[in-house]
Amino acid sequence: MSPYPRPRWLVTGASGMLGRELTPLLDRRGAAVTALGRGHLDITDGAAVRSAVAEHRPAVVVNCAAWTAVDEAESEPALAMAVNGEGPRHLAQACRAVGAVLLQLSTDYVFPGSGGRPYREDHPTGPRTVYGCTKRAGERAVLEVLPDTGYIVRTAWLYGAGGPNFVAKMIRLEADEDTVLVVDDQHGQPTWTADLADRLAALGAAALAGTAPAGIYHATNTGGTTWNALAPETFRLLGADPARVRPTTSLALARPAVRPRYSVLDQSRWKAAGLEPLRHWRAALTESFPALCGRAGRPVPGPR
């Protein structure tokens, strides 16, 4: 029997990289899914959000809509706040009106990124960028409006076949460049959208069953690495020489928004809720490769 017999799921931001992964996964598992991309629902429009949620009356809403342009947020703070801060509030208020659960995606950028140990879910936040501040505002809005049915799911370093991302860029650069410079002083967790979508589905089902407490969850592939270690691993899976990836520093590649130096996330809350956390990032990267290579028009390398 399907674990999703009747309840309807509403996915916002369904045309983005994560939404494109989550929507078909829910459909395959027998859920009734309404998928609304940016062209169908602007979450900054409170009236439109209330109307959509009232019309579809979902049991679970997963908000994949977000302003993810980290650097551009520094020069467009009001726009970023409208999407990342006010949008989740509109959704939370609409969910409260119909009794729906809300899964709100968030980010490692809510932390300062200056520590050296994995951040627990209850660790004090301290964003250093406009983007991080707007995402924290969205978290607070959801938890304020939906203390019993609001779920914050923090993730990081997303990649997948449904949109642009670091791994896809490395696949392209391996074909175009002799050597590639990648920063070696940022530590985090690459996260495959397929694995994240699977855990979102499990968390939503557990929320409906009353077995997963509301609050904050960290959802990244486990383990930790640097961009400069992820890039050579990508080259290796392509059958290319990993030594073509050369290290550089964040300072040398300065950008408008500061990047966290260390933003590895602890996932203890999954087991406390009776759910398995995501697997190790290396296993996920290996399994993701056929889809990523297919999107890039590259043949999938055989075993070496």
From Swiss-Prot:
NADH binds at residues 16-18, 42-43, 66-68, 131, 135. Its EC number is 1.1.1.133. The record marks 107 as: Could provide a fine-tuning to achieve optimal pKa matching between active site and substrate. Its cofactor is Mg(2+). NADPH binds at residues 17-18, 42-43, 66-68, 131, 135. One of its GO terms (molecular function) is dTDP-4-dehydrorhamnose reductase activity. InterPro entries: dTDP_dehydrorham_reduct, NAD(P)-bd_dom_sf, RmlD-like-bd. GO terms for biological process: dTDP-rhamnose biosynthetic process; polysaccharide biosynthetic process; streptomycin biosynthetic process. Pathway: Carbohydrate biosynthesis; dTDP-L-rhamnose biosynthesis; Antibiotic biosynthesis; streptomycin biosynthesis. It is an enzyme of class 1 (oxidoreductase). DTDP-beta-L-rhamnose binds at residues 107-108, 157. It catalyses: dTDP-beta-L-rhamnose + NADP(+) = dTDP-4-dehydro-beta-L-rhamnose + NADPH + H(+). It comes from the Bacteria. The active site is at residue 131. Binds 1 Mg(2+) ion per monomer. Keywords: Antibiotic biosynthesis, Carbohydrate metabolism, Magnesium, Metal-binding, NAD, NADP, Oxidoreductase, Streptomycin biosynthesis. GO terms for cellular component: cytosol. PANTHER family: DTDP-4-DEHYDRORHAMNOSE REDUCTASE, METHIONINE ADENOSYLTRANSFERASE 2 SUBUNIT BETA. Belongs to the dTDP-4-dehydrorhamnose reductase family. Involved in the biosynthesis of the streptose moiety of streptomycin. Catalyzes the reduction of dTDP-6-deoxy-L-lyxo-4-hexulose to yield dTDP-L-rhamnose. RmlD uses NADH and NADPH nearly equally well. Homodimer. This is dTDP-4-dehydrorhamnose reductase.
